[in-house]
Amino acid sequence: MNASHRDYCAYMALPRGPDRERFIRERSDALPEYLEAATAGDAEACFLLGRAHDVGSAGGNDSPNEAVKWYRKAAELGNVFAQYNLGVIYEGGRGIEKDEVEAARWYRKAADEGLADAQRALGNLYYSGRGLEKDEVE
């Protein structure tokens, strides 16, 4: 089992919130290994690199553009958590241009895979008519 897979499993086993962020920050020494695996197409490593740039453990500061780059690669490889995180970033315009249409697209991909948080977020966009045509039934 490679480091990215082991760390991904450990990360996902933690409760959401500060424990996950602390884990990513404490594993910054593994970033070169993640980069090697991500470059070879490992979706879990791409997600972890995205997360590291998202929370600021990759070089000390958060880097939204790098986070989006790695989340997008992980998302395109089918990682639903990366798909959801892209939706969050685009919906909030955190460090990049806000784009609710793009947020809805990524939420939809993760929602279609059964991720409850993405289903809720997509439902909120439908309800408010942001990024999608308003549809209270959908």
Predicted segments, located by residue:
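Short helix-capping/linker turns of helical repeat alpha-solenoids
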Residues: 1, 39-42, 55-57, 76-79, ...
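N-terminal segments that cap or nucleate solenoid repeat domains
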Residues: 1-52
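Small-residue hotspots
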Residues: 3-4, 10-11, 30, 50, ...
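Hydrophobic face of amphipathic alpha-helices that form TPR/SEL1-like repeat modules
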Residues: 7-17, 48-55, 83-92, 121-128
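Structural signature of tandem alpha-helical TPR/SEL1-like repeats
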Residues: 22-33, 60-70, 97-106, 133-138
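Canonical positions in the second alpha-helix
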Residues: 35-37, 73-74, 109-110
